[in-house]
Curated annotation (Swiss-Prot):
Belongs to the SecB family. This is Protein-export protein SecB. It comes from Paraburkholderia xenovorans (strain LB400). GO terms for cellular component: cytoplasm. It comes from the Bacteria. It is found in: Cytoplasm. One of the proteins required for the normal export of preproteins out of the cell cytoplasm. It is a molecular chaperone that binds to a subset of precursor proteins, maintaining them in a translocation-competent state. It also specifically binds to its receptor SecA. Keywords: Chaperone, Cytoplasm, Protein transport, Translocation, Transport. One of its GO terms (biological process) is protein tetramerization. Its main location: cytoplasm. PANTHER family: PROTEIN-EXPORT PROTEIN SECB, PTHR36918.
C-alpha cells in the first residue's frame, strides 16, 4: 500500500438543507404589534455513520420569536452535510464530527434561517457564531466523560 492511501483524508461530499419549517400562528395581527420580540435560539448536533468512512452531520436550529406571550414565528431548520473521513485515529473522529463538521455547516444554517425569516415578513435575525468546541465539551461533561460521545458516529 502506498503512503498516499494512508494519509488522513477529510472531504465534504455534500452540504444540503434537509428540512425546514416555519410557523406564524398569530399572523397577520402580530405584524401590528409595536413591542420588540424576544428571541430564543436552540442548536443541536447529531451525527450518523452512513458507511465505514462516511458520516452525515445534522445541525438543527430552532428560533422562536415572541411578542408578549404571543408567538410571532417559530422556525426549525436542519442543515446537513455528508463527510468522508478516512485514516484518522478513532479518538480524533468524534471531535472532528462534533466540532469541525458543525462549524462548517453552521453558516449555511444561519443563512437559510435568516432568509426564511425575512421572506416571512419579519425583520432579519442574525444568529451569532456558536462555539461548537464548548458545546462538545459540555456534552462530554454531561455524559460523565464517557469515552467517545458517538463511538460509532451516532448522536451528539
Amino acid at each position: 500500500m502506498s503512503d498516499e492511501n494512508n494519509q488522513p483524508f477529510f472531504n465534504i461530499q455534500r452540504i444540503y438543507l434537509k428540512d425546514m419549517s416555519l410557523e406564524q400562528p398569530n399572523s397577520p395581527g402580530i405584524f401590528l404589534e409595536q413591542e420588540m420580540p424576544s428571541v430564543e435560539v436552540e442548536v443541536d448536533v447529531k451525527a450518523e455513520r452512513l458507511a465505514e468512512t462516511v458520516f452525515e452531520i445534522l445541525v438543527t436550529g430552532t428560533v422562536t420569536a415572541k411578542v408578549s406571550d404571543k408567538v410571532a414565528f417559530l422556525i426549525e431548520a436542519k442543515q446537513a452535510g455528508i463527510f468522508d473521513i478516512r485514516n484518522i485515529p478513532a479518538e480524533q473522529i468524534d471531535p472532528l464530527v462534533g466540532i469541525a463538521c458543525p462549524t462548517i455547516l453552521f453558516p449555511y444554517l444561519r443563512s437559510n434561517i435568516a432568509d426564511a425569516i425575512t421572506r416571512a415578513g419579519f425583520p432579519p435575525i442574525h444568529l451569532a457564531e456558536i462555539n461548537f468546541q464548548a458545546l462538545y465539551e459540555q456534552r462530554l461533561a454531561q455524559m460523565g466523560g464517557q469515552d467517545g460521545a458517538a463511538q460509532n458516529g451516532v448522536t451528539h
